[in-house]
C-alpha cells in the first residue's frame, strides 16, 4: 500500500564539502515522511484489494480492524472507510477518512490497473490528498513484473498548516516472491523521481541507489524502505540525500545536508 531531477550534483565528493552548520535538515526529513505516507497509501490499498478479492470475509486489514468496506462489485470499486474517529493500523498509526480503490483485474497480475483517490483523509493528524495509479505492466527480460506508480496533485499538510505539494512517477520491479502466495515474502526495487514544493521551494528527487521494499517488514507494521538513497536537488544547490540503510526492517534514515549527516527515527 515511499513515492527526483536535474543539476549536476551527483558527481560532488561529499568528503570534500564543508560542514554546513546552519543548514536546516527539516525539509529533507519532511520529504522522507511525506514520501513514505504516499507510498503507504498505494502499498496498503493494493494489499487490501488483494485480500478482499481472495476472501471477501477478511477483516484484519493493515489500516485497522475498524475499517468499513463499501463494495461496488459492478464497477469493481472498493471504499475503505476509516471513519471520522479513525482506525489505528497494525503499524500503530491512526488514519481517518476514506480510501477509494478502483481496480481492473487482480493487482500484481500483468495488465491489471489500480486507481486510488482519497476523501477527507489524514494520517496521525497530517492531511493527505492526491490521485494515485499503481498499474502492473509486464514482465521484464529477467521475468520480474514491473509496475508503474504515480501520484498527481498530491498534498501533505502538516498540523501547523505547512503544505508540501507532491507528484511522482516511479517504476517498481517485483524481484522476489512472485511464485509464492504469501504477501509477506516479496521484495520490490523502485527507481524514478518526484517533484515537490515546500515553503516556497520547488525541488526534485531522484533515486541515487535503487530503493528496496521488503514485505516481510510489513507484517511487523514497518512500511519504510529497507535500503536505497534519494538524492534531493534544491534551488540553493546544497547537496541533500535521504539514506534508508542497508537492509534492516526499521524506521531509521540518515539525512545528509552538505557534508553533515543527521540520523532520524521516522514515525
Q: How would you name each of these model-derived features?
A:
Residues 13-267:
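Low-complexity, intrinsically disordered segments exposed to solvent
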Residues 7-11:
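C-terminal motif of bacterial Sec signal peptides marking the signal peptidase cleavage site
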Residues 1-3:
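Sec-dependent signal peptide recognition
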Amino acid at each position: 500500500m515511499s513515492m527526483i531531477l536535474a543539476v549536476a550534483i551527483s558527481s560532488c565528493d561529499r568528503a570534500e564539502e564543508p560542514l554546513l552548520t546552519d543548514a536546516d535538515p527539516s525539509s529533507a526529513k519532511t520529504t522522507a515522511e511525506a514520501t513514505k505516507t504516499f507510498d503507504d497509501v498505494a502499498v496498503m490499498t493494493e494489499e487490501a484489494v488483494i485480500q478482499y478479492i481472495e476472501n471477501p470475509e477478511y477483516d484484519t486489514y493493515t489500516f485497522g480492524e475498524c475499517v468499513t468496506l463499501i463494495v461496488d462489485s459492478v464497477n469493481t470499486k472498493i471504499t475503505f472507510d476509516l471513519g471520522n474517529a479513525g482506525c489505528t493500523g497494525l503499524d500503530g498509526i491512526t488514519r481517518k477518512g476514506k480510501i477509494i480503490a478502483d481496480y481492473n483485474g487482480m493487482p500484481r497480475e500483468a495488465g491489471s490497473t489500480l486507481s486510488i483517490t482519497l476523501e477527507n483523509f489524514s494520517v496521525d493528524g497530517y492531511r493527505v490528498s492526491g490521485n494515485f495509479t499503481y498499474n502492473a505492466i509486464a514482465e521484464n527480460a529477467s521475468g520480474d513484473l514491473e509496475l508503474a506508480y504515480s501520484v498527481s496533485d498530491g498534498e501533505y499538510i502538516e498540523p501547523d498548516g505547512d503544505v508540501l505539494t507532491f507528484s511522482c512517477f516511479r517504476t517498481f520491479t517485483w524481484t522476489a516472491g512472485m511464485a509464492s502466495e504469501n504477501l509477506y515474502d516479496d521484495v520490490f526495487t523502485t527507481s524514478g523521481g518526484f517533484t515537490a514544493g515546500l515553503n516556497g521551494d520547488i525541488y526534485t528527487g531522484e533515486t541515487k541507489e535503487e530503493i528496496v521494499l521488503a514485505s516481510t517488514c510489513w507484517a511487523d507494521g514497518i512500511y519504510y524502505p529497507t535500503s536505497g538513497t534519494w538524492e534531493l536537488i534544491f534551488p540553493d544547490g546544497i547537496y541533500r540525500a535521504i539514506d534508508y540503510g542497508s537492509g534492516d526492517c526499521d524506521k531509521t534514515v540518515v539525512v545528509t545536508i552538505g557534508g553533515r549527516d543527521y540520523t532520524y527515527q521516522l514515525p
